[in-house]
Amino acid sequence: MQAPRLCTQPLPLCVAALYQFCPLGDCAALREVLTRVCRLQGVRGTLLLAREGINGTIAGSQPGIDAVLEQIRAIPGCAQLEVKLSSATTMPFHRMKVRIRPEIVTMGQPDIDPLLSAGTYVVPHDWNALIADPATVVIDTRNDFEVAVGTFAGAVDPQTRSFSDFPAWFRAHRDALLDGKTKVAMFCTGGIRCEKSTAFLRAEGVSEVYHLKGGILKYLDDVAPADSLWRGECFVFDQRVAVGHGLAPGTHSQCHACGTPVSPQDLQSAQYEDGVSCPACHATRTDEQRAAYRERHRQEALATAQGRVHVGAVLPVRPASPR
């Protein structure tokens, strides 16, 4: 079988991060429709479908992305689809996947309905005032490896490995978190996790719950660096790895062995070997594993030099694409 060619779409490419909570009917039929239109338009990425809605990130030419978004907005309940657009100089995905899941972002709380009980939206230009209020506790709802790349000044890091760990973390730390605080402000990459986390806190009896509308990506796009309270870069679930203000490409890369974001400082570590290990996973690798990773890296480099995509070159990104 001939290996797929590298992307030949006009540059820069358009990247669309999207989600919508709405009741979906026949997800299997919808998967076929979306797979067909994405392939027809040369669009790649991942779309997740569940009875509660749609979530994903896709990339392609501007006309191609427009066509896919038009198809999604035609789905009943998706007319107000939440979309954040950015650009990329190389295709950030190897293939197109449309998958059916129990949840479009996994929290493991089946009784939570963001359509009925999500918190109050705060637009990016009002966010600084809210999180600077001494009565506000600010919580980063993302996972530990994302927070390590960047977060808001003064935000609480739950140090969770998965979003499904968040409910137990909040219940265990509730009293300390809310001590002397009357407001809770939460944020995530694109807003979808906060739809559920704010609904969860309201179900737990917390009344004043707020979340950043459009997430970190919208904040970085709207707020000037001179006015920003963001520190670092924002991890994204594609091959760009991280973005900064204006959604410009960040300085982080990614370990091909474990998927951990790698900073420029990490690249200088004696434990970093391109395609083989990084400071986060070096101690856990056997000699046999290192040899296998080196061979895979050699094959990937050869394929790239020949203008091909190595079929095994899928980065082991940790949990797939919440936002």
Model-derived features with residue positions:
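A conserved helix-loop-strand patch within extracytoplasmic ligand-binding domains
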Residues: 115, 119-123, 130-131
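Glycine-rich active-site/cofactor-binding loop and its immediate structural neighborhood
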Residues: 134
